Structure formats: C-alpha cells, structure tokens
C-alpha cells in the first residue's frame, strides 16, 4: 500500500514554550493520521466499490464527502492543537461549507455529533482537540489487494469535472464520464510568498537552480506537482469563496519552486531557525537540509529494495476498463509518508514516467490520459528531479552518496530520451550539488540586510502570515494579539496584585448592589413614592414651624414689651426666648419621628403657646388651615380663625401685612375678650428719612441719577401681584370710613399721626401748619433711625378728616409729609404721655413693619431649614425676593426725586402721579437722557410746562 506524503505541521511542546515564542518555536515531528482509521476507511471504500459496481453513486459520493470533511476538520483542529466550540475558525469552517456538506453534517446529528464521531478528534466540555498520537513515522505492514472493480484512485491526487462533477485523477485532460475537457486556468495559479523570496535571488543563481520554466508543458506539470496538498478540495474551488480554502491548497508552481518553498517554510519555522540572524543563513540551511533529506531517502530506498525484491509491479496501460486489474490501493486520508512503501516506484516507472508527488509508485492507478500526458512531457521535464523532499523528515545524518543518488535518479527518469537530455540533466544535478557555496555567497551579498531577529510565522490552518514575533522576554505585560485560546501564560506577582485589586473592587461593587437591593425591598412599591411623601411631610412641617415663628414675632412686636425692645438694643426677654426654644424643640422632635417612618398625620399638630408673650391662646397652623378649608366664607379670629378682612380679600393670612392685628368678630367672640385697635397705614412713599439740618449728611450719590430707578408701586411685603394689596388697602379704608359715618361723630377719634417730618421742625411749627383745623396739642417723638413722627390732637373728628384730605402728601420744608387719621375712641382726659405713647405705637407700625417682616421671613428663607437663632437679624438684598427686604439700588439718591414729585403735585393736584412720571421721562429724553446737571427748580418748571401743554391739548 502506498501512502501519500505527509503535510509538515509544527508540533508545539507546551511544557517548554513560553507565551512570547510559543508561535515561533516549533519542532517538526511527523504526526500521521491514525493508520488504523485509514485502513478501516480503505476497507469500507473497497466494499462500496464492489457493491456499487464502479459507479459514482449517491452513497459513494456521501461517504467521499464525509471523509473529505473529516480530513479538512482534522487539519483545522490539528493546526491549532485544540479549539473552542465557539471559536471563529471552527464556525467559519462550517459556514463556508456548501449546502450539501452542511446537510451531510446535519444528518449526522449536527456539528457536535460530527466532531464526536471523528476517529481522531475528541470533545471535552467546550473544546475539541486532537487525540494523542505516537510520535515518529508509522510504517504499516505491506498489504496486497487485488480487485477488478475500480480504476479510480482515491480523492487525493484527483480533481473534479467542471461539467458533471465526476472525480477524475489529477492531470487528466478529459472527463471519463462526459468527455468534457478539464481545463485548469493558469490565471488562478497563485504566487506564494516563498516564490517571491526566490525572485530575490540573482538571475545567474536562478539559472543554476533552474527556477525558470522554459516550456508551456511545464504548466501541466505544475498542476501534477501540487500533490496531496491539493486534494479533492479543488472540486469545490468554484463553489466556495477564496477565504474558505487555505492558500496552500491553491498554489501552483514548478516542482523546483515547490520544493524550495516548502524547505524554506520548514526551516523558517524550525526551532533552531531562531538562531539565524539573517535570511541568507536560513537559505543556506534550507539547502543543506534538503540534501540531507535526499540522502536519507536514498538509504531508506536501498534498504527497502533488499527486503522487497519480489515486489515490483509494472504499470500497465490498458484502455479496457473491464479488463483492468485493481492496483495496490493506497490510503485516501493519510498525511504520513513511508518511504519504504514506494521505494521501487522510481525504478519501475520506465515505460510511463511521472515524477509528480501524487504519482502512484508501483501501481497503475492513473488513467490512460494521465499516462499519455506524462509520456508526452517526459522529454521536456528532464530538468525536474523527484520532489521527495515533501516528506521533510529532518535528520542529522550527512549525505554521503548524494552524487551517485542524483545520477541514478536522473538516469532512471531519462530512460528512452536522447543523449542530449541526459547530459543536460547531469549538468543540472552537478550544478545543484555545487551551488551550495555560490548560493551562500550570492544570497548573503544581496539579501542580508536585516540584523534583527524578526521573521514571519505561517498559520498552518489558513496558510496566512501571522504578525512578526518578537522574542524579547523582558516582561509579561507585552501586548500580543492572539485570536486563539491555546496559550498558557505565566502569572507573575505584579499580575496577581492587579487581579487582587480588581477582585476587591468587584466584591465592593457586589456589596453595594446587595445593599441597594435590600433598600429597594424595604420600599412599599417599586417607585420613589415613599421618599416623595416623606419629603413633602418634612416641607409641610418646616412651613408650620415658620408660621409659628412669625406668629410669635407678630405677637411680641405688637405688645408693649416688644415696642420698648424695638426702640433699644436690649436682649430679647425670657418670655419670647423660652417660647421660641420650646417651638424649636417640638419641631426637631417631630422631624426625627417623620424620618423614623411615622406619618405626619399620626403626630400631634405643631403649635405654639403665645400666652407668655401677649394675650392669646395656643396657635396651630394646621388647625387654621383646616378651618379655612372647611368654612371658606366664615370669619375666624387670630385664635385659629381668619378675620373678616382676610375673608373679604380672599387671601391667606400669610399674604396679609403681618403687622396688622385683626379685631375679633363680635358675633363669634365673647364680650370678655379685649377689643384691639386696627391700625391701617397707607402705602408710604420711599423718601429719604434723614433730617435736613445744617451739617447733616448729604446724599451718598451727588449725581441725583434718580431717573434710573423705576417707581415701586407695589406692597412692600410682596414681590409679585401689585393690584391685590391696593384693592385690599382701599377696601379696608372704605370699611373704616363707612364705620365712622355710622357711629356717633363725637365718639370718633380726632388724633392725627404725622410721619416723615423734617429733623429740625418743632412742635410750634406743626401747630401753625394745622392752625385752621383747630389743633389742641402736639407731641413729637424721635426714633433710633433718625425718623420723627408727631401726634396732633384736634377738637373734632370732622377737623381731623379734613386735615387728612388737605395735608396728606404735602411738602413741609422739602419733605413729603404723611398724615394719617388714627381710628378708635379716645378718652377726654388724654395726657401728653399717652399721646407720645400712641405716636410711638403708630409710627412703629409704619417704620418697623419692614424690619419685623424681615425678622419673620429670615427664619423661613434659610436653605438648610428654618433658622433657629433668636437674634434679631436683618437680611438686606439688592433684588426683590420672597425672604428679604428689598432695598432699591438708588435708595440713597431718591430725595431729589421725592422733592420734585412733591412740588409738581402741589402745582398740578389734579394730575395723576403716573402722568407726572411720564412727563419727567419725556423731559429726560429731550435732554438726551441726562438731567443731573440741571437744578431741581428748572426741572420742576420744565416738567410743569409739559404737563400744562398736555392738559391744554387734551381739552382742545
């Protein structure tokens, strides 16, 4: 039996190869496909040949395909030692199969079942690997088989017809079934990288090595010399994409280039090839190794000749298929090579010489057309020597009888040829033998340009070039791109530290995830409703706390104790301090209970007891809100009720001026309750409160750029809607006036409160100013902010009302004086001290109102929650906010504007205030936006002219 030559595959020794040079270090062992499986398949095919009557039936085709698939799969796994079942190479191999091949595998039970049924592959978990094989060459016992069944060889060394797909021996010109000529396109013959390396040789050396082809007939020999590596995959070459085939299945080249290319690839991947520093030394080593291999092959052939002298079958060229005898059948799937099995082939091929690798040594398996083609090209192929170097069995033996062996081979191959051909062949062999020294010299001088140890590594499965391997072994952290999972890395301490750190981070992350899951499990639902409800309850509790604080401050500053404390700088009394501390303590306790999970509805409402501050009961914001929601139209007093003024204005208590103390409803309150006076101060104009005395401080800004500030017509305690406070003020004033007309005039108060007085005015001057209204007494009081107010007592209520209508808003020594009628009954024996007290109380309502509201709102404007400090704070800002007193930007320069407005109001009492402001803006536009350089009298005169012109034009 003859076995086809073995494919040279690198065998890696994992116990002695490190990560860096694992893909570079290779020991070239001949690992044959298991011969027992080969023999079994041979017997099976012989039986099929006999039973099917030499025809290419479906069963025979399926078995052939199955064997071919097993062969291809074995080569893929063998090139990588082992593969994962999900490896892209294995999956790509399956996807590139034809539909018939995939159907065949699916009929076997799928790819996994097909792998398990493979005789040379094993499947463990998620990996497929090559089973252990004995190292070295396996020499099977010689077997003799004779049969008259089939003239077909096996799949290797055969090709398929392009018309009918019938398998024909490789090199056959005409199909034996349909008679169509088999054409092998020369354009598809690819040029390998090794041939490119051969092109670098000098022309003289190429001629000596006889690399060039001299005739067209050599193209046919190239197809014959493809050998077992071509195999039956050529029958599928036109059905698959080029990426599906390894490159070495489609290489076509001359026998010399094929031998040298394979030698080059073998030595380049060999273990000791790493020690060469340039390609010239590698080329020399290739030539030496080729000569050694040829020497060893010759010795093996001589040994086999002595043992098997009786085994010398001759080739018969019988064109009759029925009378053809079955030759020595050879294996169709073996990759091993036994040189003794066909040692007599070269001697017995005298009648039909064929030096192809796939030629059957000592058999007649080739067809007649193949024999004719070989005979026709024998004369032109005398320069070709036998390519037995495909075995590439590396040995350290020296070639002793190279000359005699080569001459003997040439003499055998040139039987029947002319003497001229013999002489040329002899010269060629001599040149091949003597070219060793010249080869080194030429190649060293032309190609020895690299000094680094860098060379290409071939992938056996796909015959593609892998990235250049660097053999430096400095550190393990060098990044090397690998697509296979067949490497074992050595672990160093630095890598262990990194892995430990990553493991700790992973554990911490898992711990955090577990905590988050436990927190989510505690929630009532999957959303954040519970957190939102808790946040809303905390905000509501904080609002109630602020309302209680405001209530305490309002009670305190409207009491006599708060009035005296406001005029001085003394500390807060113990009553208000203790009340606020108790409120603060209750607030924090309720907040902690809410955070612990107790709903706000289950807790007692937050309240404050203001009995220590002034007369009153317990105040609870929640009860006030509940009463307001239950009975929106009812009037509720300060003890948890809303007064009738609040109900009439339809605004909550927080929007009402906080310095107004409502009077109890007569229908709801008992007669024992104390009546309280309701002080209503109209909107005060923002004027300078500094006294105009000699040596007094002037305005901070002398430019009098009052025109840059717009007039603020809104309520001083609000920053939004300005119409609502005006309506509220008018409604309350109308009620007081109506109430005054219904009661007895004699019982009404005749007290007037005059504010915004100049700093140098005296009581006598005030009496003279109210002379026509019958004043009886005047009391002037000065406050800590240099503000002065006077209380004027008139004889009758009618005089007081007339004085308010005539003198309110008039200018007194350059100041716009505000005159307010104090409501309520006044006893006849009113003393000056009482008048002073009333004046202080009335002026306190106006001047200290802003500061009181500032204190109250300061506690509610803290970003971190309600302010717990009990000190008197003042929050002054440049822009209006809901939590602070708004100080206009040009507050210190508004004195001149107030003076101009007062004088224009005196000259034009029937003109509205907004019309005067429009006239001033028009005057400023005429002077290009600057009025600061003009005296105030000139500005008043020019504005008055504009108002007069506008009035006259409106009348016309």
Swiss-Prot record:
According to the UniProt record, where is the region Disordered?
301-321, 831-855
Family matches, as InterPro entries: Nucleotide-bd_a/b_plait_sf, RBD_domain_sf, RRM_dom
Quote the biased-composition stretches of kind Basic and acidic residues, using this chain's numbering: 840-854
Top-level taxon of the source organism: Eukaryota
- What keywords were assigned to this record? Cytoplasm, RNA-binding
UniProt cross-references to Pfam families, sorted A to Z: RRM_1
Compartments annotated for it: namely:
Cytoplasm
Q: Name one GO molecular function term.
A: RNA binding
Cleaved signal peptide residues:
none
Note the coiled coil stretches, chain numbering: none
Q: Quick one: a GO cellular component term?
A: intercellular bridge
RRM domain boundaries = 750-824
**What does this protein do, in the record's words?**
Component of intercellular bridges during meiosis. Intercellular bridges are evolutionarily conserved structures that connect differentiating germ cells. Not required for fertility.
Q: What is this protein called?
A: RNA-binding protein 44
Which organism encodes this protein? Danio rerio (Zebrafish)
């Amino acid at each position: 039996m003859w076995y086809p030559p073995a494919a040279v595959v690198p065998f890696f020794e994992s116990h002695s190869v490190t990560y860096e040079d694992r893909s570079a270090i290779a020991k070239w062992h001949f690992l044959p496909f298991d011969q027992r499986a080969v023999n079994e398949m041979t017997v099976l095919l012989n039986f099929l040949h006999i039973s099917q009557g030499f025809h290419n039936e479906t069963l025979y085709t399926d078995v052939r395909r199955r064997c071919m698939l097993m062969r291809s799969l074995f080569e893929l796994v063998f090139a990588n030692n082992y593969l994962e079942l999900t490896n892209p190479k294995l999956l790509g191999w399956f996807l590139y199969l034809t539909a018939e091949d995939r159907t065949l595998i699916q009929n076997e039970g799928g790819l996994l079942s097909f792998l398990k049924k493979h005789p040379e592959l094993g499947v463990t978990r998620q990996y497929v690997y090559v089973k252990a094989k004995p190292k070295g060459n396996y020499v099977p016992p010689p077997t003799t088989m004779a049969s008259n069944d089939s003239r077909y060889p096996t799949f290797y060394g055969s090709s398929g017809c392009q018309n009918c797909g019938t398998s024909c021996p490789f090199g056959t010109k005409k199909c034996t079934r349909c008679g169509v000529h088999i054409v092998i396109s020369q354009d598809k013959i690819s040029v390998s990288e090794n041939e490119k390396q051969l092109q670098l040789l000098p022309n003289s050396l190429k001629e000596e090595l006889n690399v060039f082809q001299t005739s067209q007939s050599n193209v046919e020999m190239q197809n014959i010399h493809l050998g077992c590596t071509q195999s039956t995959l050529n029958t599928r070459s036109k059905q698959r994409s080029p990426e599906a085939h390894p490159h070495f299945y489609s290489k076509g080249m001359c026998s010399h280039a094929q031998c040298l290319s394979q030698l080059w690839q073998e030595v380049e991947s060999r273990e000791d090839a790493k020690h060469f520093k340039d390609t010239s030394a590698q080329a020399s080593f290739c030539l030496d190794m080729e000569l050694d291999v040829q020497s060893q092959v010759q010795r093996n052939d001589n040994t086999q000749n002595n043992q098997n002298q009786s085994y010398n079958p001759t080739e018969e060229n019988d064109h009759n298929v029925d009378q053809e005898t079955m030759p020595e059948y050879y294996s169709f799937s073996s990759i091993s090579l036994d040189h003794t099995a066909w040692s007599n082939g070269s001697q017995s091929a005298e009648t039909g010489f064929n030096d192809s690798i796939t030629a059957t040594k000592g058999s007649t398996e080739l067809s007649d057309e193949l024999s004719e083609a070989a005979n026709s090209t024998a004369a032109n192929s005398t320069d070709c020597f036998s390519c037995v170097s495909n075995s590439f069995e590396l040995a350290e033996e020296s070639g002793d009888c190279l000359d005699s062996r080569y001459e003997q081979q040439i003499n055998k191959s040139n039987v029947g040829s002319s003497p001229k051909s013999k002489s040329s062949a002899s010269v060629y062999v001599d040149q091949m033998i003597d070219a060793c020294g010249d080869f080194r010299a030429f190649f060293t001088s032309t190609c020895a340009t690299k000094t680094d140890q860098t060379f290409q590594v071939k992938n056996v499965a796909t015959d593609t070039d892998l990235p250049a391997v660097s053999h430096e072994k400095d550190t393990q952290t060098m990044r090397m791109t690998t697509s296979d999972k067949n490497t074992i890395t050595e672990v160093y301490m630095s890598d262990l530290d990194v892995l430990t750190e990553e493991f700790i981070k992973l554990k911490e992350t898992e711990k955090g995830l577990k905590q988050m899951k436990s927190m989510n499990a505690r929630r009532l639902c999957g959303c954040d409703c519970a957190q939102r409800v808790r946040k809303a309850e905390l905000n509501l509790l904080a609002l109630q706390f602020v309302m209680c604080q405001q209530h305490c401050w309002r009670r305190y500053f409207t009491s006599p104790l708060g009035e005296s404390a406001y005029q001085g700088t003394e500390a807060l009394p113990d009553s208000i301090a203790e009340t606020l501390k108790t409120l603060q303590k209750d607030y924090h306790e309720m907040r902690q209970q809410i955070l612990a999970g107790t709903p706000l509805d289950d807790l007692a409402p937050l309240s404050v007891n203001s009995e220590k501050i002034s007369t009153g009961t317990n105040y609870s914001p929640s009860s006030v809100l509940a009463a307001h929601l239950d009975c929106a139209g009812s009037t509720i007093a300060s003890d948890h009720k809303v007064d009738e003024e609040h109900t009439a204005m339809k605004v909550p208590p927080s929007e009402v001026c906080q310095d107004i103390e409502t009077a109890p409803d007569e229908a709801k309150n008992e007669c024992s309750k104390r009546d309280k006076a309701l002080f209503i101060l109209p909107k005060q104009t923002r004027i300078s409160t500094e006294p105009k005395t000699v040596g007094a401080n002037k305005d901070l800004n002398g430019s009098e750029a009052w025109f840059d500030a717009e007039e603020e017509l809104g309520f001083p305690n609000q920053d939004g809607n300005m119409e609502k406070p005006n309506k509220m003020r008018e409604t309350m004033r109308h009620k007081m006036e109506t109430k005054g007309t219904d009661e007895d005039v004699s019982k009404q108060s005749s007290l007037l409160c005059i504010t915004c007085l100049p700093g140098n005015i005296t009581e006598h001057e005030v009496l003279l100013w109210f002379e026509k209204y019958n004043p009886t007494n005047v009391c002037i009081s000065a406050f800590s902010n240099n503000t002065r107010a006077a209380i004027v007592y008139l004889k009758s209520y009618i005089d007081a009302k007339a004085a308010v209508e005539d003198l309110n808003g008039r200018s007194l020594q350059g100041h716009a004086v505000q005159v307010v009628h104090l409501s309520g009954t006044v006893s006849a024996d009113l003393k000056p001290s009482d008048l002073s007290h009333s004046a202080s109380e009335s002026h306190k309502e106006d001047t200290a109102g802003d500061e009181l509201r500032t204190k109250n709102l300061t506690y509610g404007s803290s970003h971190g929650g309600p302010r717990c400090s009990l000190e008197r704070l003042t929050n002054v800002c440049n822009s209006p906010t809901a939590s602070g007193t708004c100080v206009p930007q040009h507050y210190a320069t508004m004195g001149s504007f107030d003076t101009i407005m007062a004088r224009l109001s005196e000259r034009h009492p029937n003109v509205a205030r907004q019309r005067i402001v429009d006239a001033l803006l028009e005057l400023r536009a005429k002077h290009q936006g600057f009025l600061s350089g003009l005296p105030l009298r000139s500005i008043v005169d020019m504005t008055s002219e504009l108002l007069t012109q506008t009035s006259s034009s409106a009348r016309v």
